[in-house]
Amino acid sequence: VLSPQLLQTIHAPLVKTPGERARLRKFLERVNEAHYGLGWRQYDYAGYKVIGHRGGVNGYRSLILFDPRLKSGVVALWNSNTSQPGGLEFEVMDMLYGLPFRDWMELDSKPARTPEPADQEEREHAA
């Protein structure tokens, strides 16, 4: 268990990162500022301080975003090379804050994608 003082230190914004805000361009109506510090990103999300991190390696992705004041947030882990379900974290935060619904994941506006078979045997079976 980490002390509150240590959590405050590692979650403190150290560097303003306008490039991160640009990367999140589809969320700009709610992401007002982005910072980085000791492995964590800090965002001003619709006037609320939220902290998060995301990353991935071949075939696996993860994200975490939370509001330390509310002691609430979201964690998602998925096996994929795509960024989908990118936006899930913001849909959850909108629910926490009582903000109007936005389809941040764009599930209703993207055509369904056929998953790729996992190996050669499945590809041959699917053909």
What are these regions (language model features)?
Residues 1-127:
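Catalytic loop of the DD-peptidase/beta-lactamase superfamily, centered on the K-T-G motif
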